[in-house]
């Protein structure tokens, strides 16, 4: 057969095959190919992880190109649960879409829309009340009755200028929250108190996990040496809570309810102590601990000062179900809320927002902080909100962040910060004893829970239901 005749036959076969295809098949193209076409058509650069997008295809790809780049990218990416964000004059990133994170630009637009709805202090207070009630209702906390707060203490020890004692609180019948209380060794009268929840910081052993980590011990002990009582406590289904509930339950929505409830009960406990000044109670935590900081401050006026660290963001809602696993940001009959609005509910109470340059708080000085100042201005109290931004720091509660917090708390709660400063005036944490995790176990090495301790989330749900009767 002659070559020319062979080519003709092949072309005819190809034509017949194409004629037998549906439009969906004809226009189906690999995403990588489509994105390259976008770059060529609009003269832009798209940055993305090829492995992350591997195997994805675009239906009716050729028909998703419009006169403007934005519409084109929306039509291509949204059906695939992808999103884009402008990062330069003609460059964009393409990433997976997650329900708990938006783009920086969308976060800024959201704040702009929200602030326009607060004509004055009165309208803000109305919105604040609605958001607060929504947080309580969605978590199922509104109707929960408080049971007697049983307190179990163990392993009291003394260190340089402070003491530590392990404490478990029975926050619901048969449900225990474990923590450690740090106090100054010597004090007179009533002293300030701080809640210290932790975030999602992991280690190979308990010594590097959650509240047992050195950074949490440093901040609690240093505050105690300065003159405050500090309650450091574990997240739900972490630490000793995992003796009752499997750690996997931490990553479910019930964890959000329990962590908020735990913070409320910690407040109850601190307010019950005769040596604690109820007018000087604050809270600070990083990452997921920052989320807990904002939520408890938003819903409970007993918190008089807050320091949310590496968490407050207009576009990031918290990547764990213990932070965003329930629709606490979705307001019926009103615009959606976000963590900046939650944070603003602290106003006019003192708040320090600590941010860094390597996570979702990287734009805080430009986006979130100016917005917060506008809310505080409604009360004439702009001086009560501050931002310490550390552009070269990473996502943690490291020394640079801790010293900013020490200074802020000392100024507002009249703590004796000179006690923990060296001759140059720099904060010195060398007098803190870093304990192994086992020293902080309320139920000891034997992990002996009280006899009435429940086990499993099904039992917990029944207890919660009983608390609403």
Q: PLM features: what roles do these ranges have?
A:
Residues 317-377:
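The feature captures the conserved acid-bearing segment of alpha/beta-hydrolase catalytic domains
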Residues 1-25:
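Bacterial Sec-dependent N-terminal signal peptides
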Residues 96-176, 354-469:
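Alpha/beta-hydrolase-fold serine-hydrolase catalytic core, especially in secreted/extracellular enzymes
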Residues 20-98:
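N-terminal export/assembly leaders
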Residues 155-212:
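Glycine-rich active-site/cofactor-binding loop and its immediate structural neighborhood
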Residues 177, 181-182, 193-194, 217-233, ...:
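Carboxylate/His-rich catalytic cores and anion/metal-binding grooves
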Residues 268-335:
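Primarily recognizes the serine-hydrolase "nucleophile elbow" in alpha/beta-hydrolase
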Residues 188-272, 312-322, 328:
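Cap/lid segment of the alpha/beta-hydrolase catalytic domain
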């Amino acid at each position: 057969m002659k070559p020319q005749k062979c080519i003709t036959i092949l072309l005819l076969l190809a034509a017949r095959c194409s004629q037998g295809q549906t439009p969906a098949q004809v226009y189906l193209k690999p995403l990588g190919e489509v994105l390259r076409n976008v770059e060529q058509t609009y003269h832009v650069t798209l940055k993305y992880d090829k492995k992350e997008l591997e195997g994805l295809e675009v239906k009716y790809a050729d028909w998703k190109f419009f006169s403007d780049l934005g519409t084109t990218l929306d039509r291509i990416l949204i059906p695939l649960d992808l999103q884009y964000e402008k990062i330069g004059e003609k460059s964009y990133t393409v990433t997976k879409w997650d329900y708990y994170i938006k783009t920086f630009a969308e976060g800024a637009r959201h704040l702009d829309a929200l602030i326009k709805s607060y004509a004055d202090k009165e309208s803000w207070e109305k919105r604040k009340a609605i958001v607060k009630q929504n947080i309580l209702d969605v978590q199922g906390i509104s109707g929960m009755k408080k049971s007697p707060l049983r307190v179990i203490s163990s392993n009291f020890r003394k260190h340089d200028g402070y003491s530590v004692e392990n404490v478990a609180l029975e926050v619901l019948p048969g449900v225990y929250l474990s923590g450690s209380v740090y106090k100054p060794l010597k004090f007179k009268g009533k002293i300030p108190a701080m809640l210290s929840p932790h975030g999602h910081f992991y280690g190979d052993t308990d010594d590097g996990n959650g509240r047992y980590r050195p950074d949490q011990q440093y901040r609690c002990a240093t505050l105690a040496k300065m003159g405050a009582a500090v309650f450091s406590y574990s997240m739900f289904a972490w630490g000793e809570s995992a003796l009752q509930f499997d750690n996997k339950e931490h990553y479910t929505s019930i964890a959000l309810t329990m962590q908020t409830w735990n913070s409320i009960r910690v407040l109850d406990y601190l307010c019950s102590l005769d040596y604690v000044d109820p007018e000087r109670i604050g809270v600070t935590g990083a990452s997921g601990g920052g989320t807990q900081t904002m939520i408890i401050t938003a819903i409970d006026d007993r918190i008089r000062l807050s320091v949310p660290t590496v968490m407050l963001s207009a576009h990031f809602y918290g990547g764990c179900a213990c932070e965003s696993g329930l629709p606490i940001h979705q307001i019926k009959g009103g615009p959606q809320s976000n963590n900046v609005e939650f944070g603003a509910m602290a106003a006019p109470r003192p708040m320090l927002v600590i941010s860094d340059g390597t996570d979702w708080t990287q734009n805080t000085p430009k986006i979130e902080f100016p917005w917060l100042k506008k809310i505080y201005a409604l009360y004439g109290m702009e001086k009560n909100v501050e931002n310490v931004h550390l552009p070269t720091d990473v996502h943690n509660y490291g020394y640079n962040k801790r010293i900013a917090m020490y200074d802020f708390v000392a100024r507002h709660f009249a703590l004796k910060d000179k006690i923990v400063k060296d001759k140059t005036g720099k904060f010195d944490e060398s007098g803190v004893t870093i304990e192994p995790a086992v020293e902080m176990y309320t139920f000891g090495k034997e992990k002996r829970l009280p006899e009435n301790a429940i086990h499993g989330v099904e039992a917990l749900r029944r207890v919660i239901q009983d608390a609403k009767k």
